[in-house]
Amino acid sequence: LSYGFVNDYTGPSGHQDYFTTMPSLLAKVAQSDKIDEYKVEPEVKALFEKGDFGQYKDGKSGEMQLCFLTNNDITGGNSGSPMFNGKGELIGLAFDGNWDAMSSDISFTQDLTRCIGVDIRYVLYVIDQWGHADRLIREVGL
Protein backbone atom coordinates (compact mmCIF):
# COMPACT_ATOMS: atom_id res chain seq x y z
CA LEU A 1 0.00 0.00 0.00
CA SER A 2 1.27 3.43 -0.95
CA TYR A 3 -0.28 6.83 -0.44
CA GLY A 4 0.47 10.29 -1.70
CA PHE A 5 -0.86 13.44 -3.25
CA VAL A 6 -1.55 14.54 -6.81
CA ASN A 7 0.83 17.40 -7.53
CA ASP A 8 3.13 19.12 -10.02
CA TYR A 9 6.75 18.21 -10.44
CA THR A 10 9.77 20.47 -10.56
CA GLY A 11 13.17 18.84 -10.72
CA PRO A 12 16.37 18.56 -12.74
CA SER A 13 14.40 17.85 -15.92
CA GLY A 14 12.17 20.93 -15.50
CA HIS A 15 8.58 21.65 -14.45
CA GLN A 16 5.57 19.49 -15.31
CA ASP A 17 1.97 20.28 -14.45
CA TYR A 18 0.20 17.52 -12.56
CA PHE A 19 -1.90 16.39 -15.53
CA THR A 20 -1.65 16.04 -19.30
CA THR A 21 -4.44 16.87 -21.74
CA MET A 22 -5.61 15.88 -25.19
CA PRO A 23 -3.91 18.89 -26.88
CA SER A 24 -0.55 17.67 -25.52
CA LEU A 25 -1.19 14.20 -26.95
CA LEU A 26 -2.27 15.61 -30.32
CA ALA A 27 0.89 17.76 -30.40
CA LYS A 28 2.92 14.56 -30.16
CA VAL A 29 0.78 12.84 -32.81
CA ALA A 30 1.55 15.80 -35.11
CA GLN A 31 5.23 14.79 -34.89
CA SER A 32 4.52 11.17 -35.88
CA ASP A 33 6.10 11.59 -39.30
CA LYS A 34 9.43 12.00 -37.45
CA ILE A 35 8.86 9.85 -34.35
CA ASP A 36 7.30 6.42 -34.88
CA GLU A 37 6.25 6.07 -31.22
CA TYR A 38 3.79 8.96 -31.71
CA LYS A 39 1.82 7.28 -34.50
CA VAL A 40 -1.83 6.40 -33.89
CA GLU A 41 -4.49 4.82 -36.07
CA PRO A 42 -6.29 7.41 -38.24
CA GLU A 43 -9.66 6.62 -36.62
CA VAL A 44 -8.17 7.19 -33.16
CA LYS A 45 -6.68 10.51 -34.25
CA ALA A 46 -10.03 11.60 -35.73
CA LEU A 47 -11.83 10.63 -32.51
CA PHE A 48 -9.38 12.62 -30.38
CA GLU A 49 -9.51 15.64 -32.71
CA LYS A 50 -13.32 15.62 -32.59
CA GLY A 51 -13.02 16.64 -28.95
CA ASP A 52 -16.40 15.31 -27.84
CA PHE A 53 -15.40 14.07 -24.40
CA GLY A 54 -18.82 14.43 -22.77
CA GLN A 55 -19.06 12.97 -19.28
CA TYR A 56 -15.38 12.02 -19.27
CA LYS A 57 -13.90 15.53 -19.24
CA ASP A 58 -12.85 17.10 -15.96
CA GLY A 59 -15.57 19.18 -14.34
CA LYS A 60 -13.21 21.88 -13.06
CA SER A 61 -10.81 22.35 -15.97
CA GLY A 62 -13.18 21.30 -18.76
CA GLU A 63 -10.26 19.33 -20.22
CA MET A 64 -9.93 15.66 -21.02
CA GLN A 65 -7.23 14.74 -18.53
CA LEU A 66 -5.11 11.83 -19.73
CA CYS A 67 -2.47 11.16 -17.10
CA PHE A 68 -1.52 12.65 -13.76
CA LEU A 69 1.39 12.78 -11.33
CA THR A 70 1.44 11.80 -7.68
CA ASN A 71 4.20 11.54 -5.12
CA ASN A 72 3.29 7.91 -4.42
CA ASP A 73 6.12 5.42 -4.12
CA ILE A 74 6.02 3.00 -7.06
CA THR A 75 8.22 0.05 -7.95
CA GLY A 76 8.47 -2.60 -10.64
CA GLY A 77 5.32 -4.70 -10.75
CA ASN A 78 2.98 -1.85 -9.77
CA SER A 79 1.78 -1.19 -13.31
CA GLY A 80 -1.98 -1.43 -13.44
CA SER A 81 -2.40 -0.92 -9.70
CA PRO A 82 -5.54 1.04 -8.83
CA MET A 83 -5.20 4.60 -7.55
CA PHE A 84 -7.91 5.92 -5.25
CA ASN A 85 -8.70 9.38 -3.93
CA GLY A 86 -9.33 10.16 -0.27
CA LYS A 87 -12.99 9.15 -0.69
CA GLY A 88 -12.04 5.67 -1.90
CA GLU A 89 -13.06 6.44 -5.50
CA LEU A 90 -11.02 4.96 -8.34
CA ILE A 91 -9.25 7.83 -10.11
CA GLY A 92 -6.65 6.02 -12.18
CA LEU A 93 -4.19 3.22 -12.75
CA ALA A 94 -0.48 3.49 -11.91
CA PHE A 95 1.78 2.62 -14.80
CA ASP A 96 5.15 4.33 -14.55
CA GLY A 97 7.44 6.70 -12.69
CA ASN A 98 9.32 9.79 -13.79
CA TRP A 99 13.02 9.53 -14.56
CA ASP A 100 13.95 10.75 -11.10
CA ALA A 101 11.89 7.91 -9.59
CA MET A 102 14.10 5.21 -11.08
CA SER A 103 16.27 5.15 -7.95
CA SER A 104 13.30 5.09 -5.55
CA ASP A 105 13.72 1.37 -4.80
CA ILE A 106 16.96 2.38 -3.08
CA SER A 107 16.21 5.94 -1.98
CA PHE A 108 12.71 7.45 -2.11
CA THR A 109 12.71 11.25 -2.37
CA GLN A 110 9.22 12.71 -2.04
CA ASP A 111 10.24 15.98 -3.72
CA LEU A 112 11.55 14.30 -6.89
CA THR A 113 9.79 10.95 -7.16
CA ARG A 114 6.55 10.87 -9.12
CA CYS A 115 4.22 8.04 -10.00
CA ILE A 116 2.45 8.44 -13.34
CA GLY A 117 -1.16 7.29 -13.47
CA VAL A 118 -3.61 7.15 -16.35
CA ASP A 119 -6.85 8.96 -15.49
CA ILE A 120 -9.70 6.45 -15.24
CA ARG A 121 -11.99 8.86 -17.13
CA TYR A 122 -9.64 8.64 -20.13
CA VAL A 123 -9.63 4.84 -19.88
CA LEU A 124 -13.44 4.80 -19.81
CA TYR A 125 -13.62 7.27 -22.71
CA VAL A 126 -11.43 4.99 -24.87
CA ILE A 127 -13.44 1.90 -23.85
CA ASP A 128 -16.69 3.72 -24.68
CA GLN A 129 -15.92 5.86 -27.72
CA TRP A 130 -13.23 3.88 -29.51
CA GLY A 131 -13.87 0.36 -28.25
CA HIS A 132 -17.66 0.72 -28.37
CA ALA A 133 -17.80 -1.65 -25.40
CA ASP A 134 -21.32 -0.64 -24.40
CA ARG A 135 -21.79 -3.66 -22.15
CA LEU A 136 -18.74 -2.74 -20.08
CA ILE A 137 -19.85 0.88 -19.80
CA ARG A 138 -23.32 -0.21 -18.64
CA GLU A 139 -21.78 -2.67 -16.19
CA VAL A 140 -19.83 0.10 -14.44
CA GLY A 141 -22.98 2.22 -14.34
CA LEU A 142 -22.19 4.97 -16.84
PLM regions: where:
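Serine endopeptidase catalytic core focused on the charge-relay Asp
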Residues: 1-77, 84-142
